[in-house]
Design a protein with these regions (language model features):
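Conserved AMP-binding A3 loop
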Residues: 58-88, 92-95
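Conserved pre-ATP/AMP-binding loop-to-beta segment of ANL
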Residues: 11, 47-64, 96-99
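ATP-dependent adenylate-forming carboxylate-activation enzymes
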Residues: 6-10, 32-40, 123-145, 294-299
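AMP-binding/adenylate-forming
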Residues: 27-28, 78-88, 99-166, 204
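Conserved ATP/PPi-binding loop(s) of AMP-dependent carboxylate-activating enzymes
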Residues: 222, 231-256, 260-261, 282, ...
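Gly/Ser/Thr-rich phosphate-binding loop
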Residues: 167-219
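Conserved C-terminal "lid"/linker of ANL adenylate-forming enzymes
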Residues: 287, 314, 326-328, 348-399
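AMP-binding/adenylate-forming catalytic core of the ANL superfamily
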Residues: 240, 268-359
Length: 399
């Protein structure tokens, strides 16, 4: 099986390769980030006896996962049928095909799908300016796209939370000029979607992953292509034609029930009274402190309810409790010692009031910027390094 490797940084080549792959599909394709040495080596090091997912005639798109909690990304094999199934379901959910503005990296499924959706709609994708996202530059791209697109053709984009926040703060007209804005990549602060709604922007929260060809649940409702259920352990399972065929160099994680393939996610969820899916955390978000289970995502949400900016809850080893909750808090200013202590105590009390003593943070540290991945997710590995560095420097509040 020949594998074509294309660097995501060469965006024009990546777009052309993706479109050719969708319509021709004669070669297995992988669009990789510049720093993806490990995935590249794994693909290039494929031995002659390596099993081919889907058989000799299958030429999948191989996409590396973007999770922030694993050192080794999975190499996900997606068939053209899976990608097209997802694209069609998105088109149906949004009210019809349209033109897409690509702001996200083409090494990630969210960025890739903007190209796929545009291509199958008969439109070329519009590439936003490269480099660090700038809301005003993005607004200019939207304005130019609107001017060059027929009024009858909807204009869409996909963003992550930090990009949405930047647009709300600096270029809200970019959001209101679009017919729909998909926002995924992890937890989306409800205050952001509320602000977007107040200015008349249509923002849709998406849930999905590389293994499901991208978002397959919009605002808590599964797309037509997706079937979602909650296992007895509270973990979300997903089925549908948009599922991957397997991992490139790992055993398949898919299970089968009555001939139906199911993917067991790493997310916890529940179905609300109105039938929507609510994500309550990740499996690895659940820790034990003093024998009591604590959901780190719930800790973050409680801290946000106090008006804190971006926060990251982590578990640190504790000689008494086994583990305790630590909070890394992002602030624009440089707080004084007394301000740090006051804020830390308020955060601890707020979380304790919401979730109980075991969830109350025993370590709180402040930073100008919480580290993020290229897709806008908190990089928990770097965040842990950051909070440990602050502790060693004596610059963290501890109880």
């Amino acid at each position: 099986m020949a594998i074509q490797l294309v660097p995501a940084s060469d965006r024009s080549s990546a777009v052309n390769a993706l479109i050719k792959h969708i319509f021709d599909g004669e070669t297995t394709l992988a669009v990789l980030a510049e720093d993806s040495g490990q995935p590249s080596n794994r693909l290039l090091g494929r031995g002659p006896n390596h099993p081919i997912v889907g058989g000799e005639q299958c030429h999948p798109l191989i996409v590396a996962t973007s999770g922030s909690t694993t050192e080794k990304p999975h190499l996900v094999c997606l068939t053209t049928e899976a990608l097209l199934s997802s694209a069609q379901a998105t088109s149906d959910a949004l009210g019809g095909p349209g033109r897409w503005i690509t702001t996200l990296p083409l090494s990630h499924i969210a960025g890739i799908q903007t190209v796929v959706r545009a291509a199958v709609s008969g439109h070329s994708p519009i590439l936003a300016p490269p480099g660090h996202f700038n809301a005003k530059d993005f607004a200019r791209t939207v304005r130019e796209a609107r001017e060059s697109t027929l009024p009858s053709v909807p204009l869409y984009t996909s963003l992550v939370s930090p990009q949405l926040a930047a647009c709300l703060d600096h270029a809200p007209e970019a959001l209101t000029s679009l017919d729909s804005v998909l926002v995924g990549g992890g937890f989306v602060d409800p205050s952001l979607t509320e602000r977007a709604e107040r200015i008349g922007a249509r923002v849709i929260r998406t849930y999905g992953m590389t293994e499901t060809s991208g978002g397959c649940v919009y605002d808590g409702i599964p797309l037509d292509c997706a079937t979602v259920k909650i296992g007895s352990d509270g973990i979300i399972l997903i089925a549908g034609p948009m599922l991957m065929s397997g991992y490139f160099d790992e055993p398949t994680p898919l299970s089968y029930e009555d001939g139906q393939a199911w993917f067991k996610t790493s997310d916890l969820g529940e179905t609300t009274e109105d039938g929507t899916l609510k994500i309550t955390g990740r499996v690895d978000d659940i820790i034990k402190s003093g024998g009591v289970k604590v959901n780190l995502r719930a800790v973050e949400e409680a801290a946000l309810s106090l008006g804190a900016g971006m926060v990251c809850a982590l578990a640190l080893p504790d000689p008494t409790w086994g583990q305790h909750v630590a909070l890394l808090v992002e602030r624009d200013d440089v707080p004084t010692l007394s301000q740090k202590e006051k804020c830390a105590r308020e955060l601890r009390e707020a979380v304790r009031d919401y979730l109980g003593d075991a969830a109350a943070p025993r370590t709180v540290a402040f930073t100008r910027q919480i580290p993020l991945t290229s897709l806008g997710k908190v990089d928990r590995t770097l965040a842990r390094q950051q909070i440990n560095d602050l502790i060693r420097q004596g610059d963290a509040w501890r109880r």
